[in-house]
Amino acid sequence: LARWAAIAVAALASAACDPQRISELEEGVSTEMDVRDRFGVPDNVWNEPGGAHTLEYNRQPAGQRNYMITIGADGKMSALRQVLTPENFARITPGMEMQEVRRRLGKPAKVTPYALSGETHHDWRFLEPPTTPLVFSVITTDGRSVARTMTTPDMDAPENGRGR
């Protein structure tokens, strides 16, 4: 338990520094090394067309944001996006492959299989602007594609009286 608490504290501290890190980066100017110096080793690297690639910086399960930072073929940062937004969630539709969901949203905070229903819930914690903590869930029945989605209050959020 102490180990998990330490991990959660470290993740929250890291996420708290994100606005400062972001302010130090500039699209078209900052290099991949600049990004890695500020954000560290990415959780995943996604290849893009034309020699570009996207670095995934995951703030789950303790945080409420995930960042995708695209590095162009020229080695310069071309985009920095916080991807856990209602607009991105609206793009997740039934039938979409989970690999594409993972690519769009980053690693979920939690994956929970429910044996009786045959469903698996993939949950991402996020903030509905300005400060409402919610959970976006993608439900699969075959483990490979989206059956449906839903958004619910984040009952584990400190704002709701139950910190992690």
Regions found by a protein language model. Give the residues of each.
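Residues within mature, well-folded domains
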Residues: C17-R164
